[in-house]
Swiss-Prot record:
It is an enzyme of class 3 (hydrolase). Mg(2+) 2 binds at D405. Disulfide bonds: none annotated. Poly(A) nuclease with 3'-5' RNase activity. Catalytic component of the CCR4-NOT complex which is one of the major cellular mRNA deadenylases and is linked to various cellular processes including bulk mRNA degradation, miRNA-mediated repression, translational repression during translational initiation and general transcription regulation. Additional complex functions may be a consequence of its influence on mRNA expression. InterPro entries: CCR4/nocturin_mRNA_transcr (IPR050410), Deadenylase_CCR4b (IPR034967), Endo/exonu/phosph_ase_sf (IPR036691), Endo/exonuclease/phosphatase (IPR005135), Leu-rich_rpt (IPR001611), Leu-rich_rpt_typical-subtyp (IPR003591), LRR_dom_sf (IPR032675). Signal peptide: none annotated. The keyword Nucleus applies. It comes from Xenopus laevis. Its cofactor is Mg(2+). It catalyses: Exonucleolytic cleavage of poly(A) to 5'-AMP. This is CCR4-NOT transcription complex subunit 6-like-B. Residues 1-148 are annotated as: Required for interaction with cnot1, cnot3 and cnot7. PROSITE patterns: LRR (PS51450). It is found in: Cytoplasm; Nucleus.
């Protein structure tokens, strides 16, 4: 788990008392440390209302018990209970996951609640001078004994077998009963690759629940239960694509396409098995494959660097990729018994999937990777829609669905770019780095176009999960936010509904510090939406050609 800097409390416990003048002038008092001493036998219930406390000194008293209410002090980083008469600890102490130091020296403790294993941020655990059982002492006295003991307790903590509550289906629009349309469902899911699921990153999760053999069952159960027509997955390990995902989904009537990150090209056969990438699966009953493409961002960065050091040193060094499939829609359009105009033409659908760079310090890289990907998709669509002797078709001529782990929040330049059709070439996410000369290569105007201060893409996209329908798609201890998205071209597609969030009250009641969790197999929540595809050419009704829907 990434460790924030922790400064232990000053042992001198220096304090100042405000003067009458400071009080009169409205100066606010601030105290987040408290010491209680004097051979105290019991604690006032009002203590547990001081939820702002970060440090609590309760040593050298005559306390024989600590009530479960200790869990209310959720900001505590330091708790000293040394030299008391404690014979047991409340299991609820394990919910104070902010703790960095827990001192229990010189008490009467024989056993410890396994719930202490949840204190994954602890850096100091004092247990000396307690008549603890030999199995606890044996672990504790080993090299790195504190960590081994906490891991042992977490791994052996019983987990309630209760089922996850069902996520609600949120209906946003009824299916069009007049105009012809085809409904289809799309899933987007970052499954958390095995090599990234480490105790260092996810210290709050038992090791057995991080193990891929355990997690893959929950992941496949979720994919199967969603039963989507199109499935976009990120962080799919190469070997798992061929041994798990593709065989299991092929049995259920899917075909698929997968590409690993670019680094796989320079690895041995054994090493490349563990490289992750992006996969798209589609139900063959509804779609057939026309084209498939892999977009390697580092190659595009190198080809379009235009002398920009930032492009070479920051963008080209990241080996993220995107994939796309051009599909032919099998299902006939229907609505009030009508067939679409130009029904002899194939109805195509572009589906794309990408996983952008993760580091928050590289907002410029995420934005440029997104621009490169969308620019490539625009070229693919225009080429697929072109006809001999006809002008270059509009990029919106083929319906388009984009699934991605963008590693970017809704207020980012990445989401602004996709939603609004472009961003300013001096957007703050570029970090004032010198990209201007190469960014025009990815804009609608092209390299030789007239500069207008914006980088645009020409698509008309909308997010399926608008209006904060999901409070977060990634849920870890250190970060909770929306970084996964499904976008669709609003010229041809409507969203009918989406799968809503997991009940936040359940998360709270079960003290879910972060995911993965024994009941939740990834650190991401899947997205699922039902979309409605309308044909680009609408039929004639009573001699009148219906106008465009937008």
């Amino acid at each position: 788990m990434p460790k924030e800097k922790y400064d232990p409390p000053d042992p001198r416990r220096i304090y100042t008392i405000m003067s009458a003048e400071e009080v009169a002038n409205g100066k606010k008092s601030r105290w987040d440390e408290l010491e209680i001493s004097g051979r105290v036998r019991s604690l006032s219930m009002s203590l547990w209302s001081l939820t702002h406390l970060t440090v609590l000194h309760l040593s050298d008293n005559n306390l024989s018990r600590i009530p479960p209410d200790i869990a209310k002090l959720h900001n505590l980083v330091y708790l000293d209970l040394s030299s008391n008469k404690l014979r047991s600890l409340p299991a609820e102490l394990g919910n104070v996951v902010s703790l960095r130091e827990l001192l229990l020296n010189n008490n009467l403790l024989r056993v410890l609640p396994f719930e202490l294993g949840r204190l994954f941020r602890l850096q100091t655990l004092g247990l000396k001078g307690n008549p603890l059982s030999q199995d606890i002492l044996g672990l504790y006295q080993e090299p790195d004994g504190m960590r081994k003991l906490l891991n042992y307790m977490l791994d052996n903590l019983s987990v309630h077998p209760e089922q996850l509550p069902q996520r609600p289906w949120i209906t946003l629009k009824e299916r069009d009963q007049i105009l012809p349309s085809v409904p289809f469902t799309v899933m987007c899911f970052n499954v958390l690759c095995d090599k990234y699921a480490t105790r260092q990153l996810y210290g709050y999760c038992p090791s057995w629940a991080l193990n891929w053999e355990y997690r893959k069952k929950g992941i496949m159960e979720e994919i199967v239960s969603c039963d989507a027509d199109i499935i976009s997955l990120q962080e799919v390990e190469t070997e798992q694509y061929y041994t798990l995902f593709m065989p299991a989904l092929k049995e259920r009537g899917y075909d698929g396409f997968f590409s690993p990150k670019s680094r796989a090209k320079i690895m041995s056969d054994q090493e490349k098995k563990h490289v992750d990438g992006c996969a798209i699966f589609f139900r063959t009953e509804k779609f057939s494959l026309v084209q498939k493409h892999t977009v390697e961002f580092n190659q595009i960065a190198m080809a379009n660097s235009e002398g920009s050091e930032a492009m070479l040193n920051r963008v080209m060094t990241k080996d993220n990729i995107g994939v796309s499939v051009l599909l032919e829609v099998h299902t006939d359009f229907s609505g009030a018994g009508m067939k679409p105009h130009h029904s002899s033409e194939k109805q195509l659908l572009m589906v794309a999937n990408a996983h952008m760079h993760w580091d928050p310090e590289y907002s410029d890289v995420k934005l440029i990777q997104t621009m490169m990907f969308v620019s490539e998709l625009k070229s693919i669509i225009e080429k697929a829609a072109s006809r001999p002797g006809s002008p270059t078709p509009d990029s919106n001529s083929i319906p388009f669905v984009l699934c991605a782990d963008l590693n970017s929040l809704p207020d980012s330049g990445v989401v602004e770019y996709l939603t609004n059709g472009g961003v300013a070439d001096n957007h703050k996410d570029f970090k004032e780095l010198r990209y201007n000369e190469c960014l025009t290569n990815f804009s609608c105007n092209g390299k030789n176009g007239t500069p207008d201060g914006r980088i645009t893409h020409g698509f008309q996209l909308r997010s399926a999960y608008e209006n904060n329908l999901m409070p977060y798609t990634n849920y870890t201890f250190d970060f909770k936010g929306v970084i996964d998205y499904i976008f669709y071209s609003k010229t041809h597609i409507d969203v009918l509904g989406v799968l809503g969030p997991l009940d936040p009250q359940w998360m709270m009641d079960n003290n879910i510090a972060g995911c993965p969790h024994p009941h939740i197999p990834s650190d991401h929540f899947s997205l699922l939406t039902q979309l409605e595809l309308h044909p680009p050419f609408l039929p004639v009704i009573n001699g009148v050609h219906l106008p465009s829907r937008r």
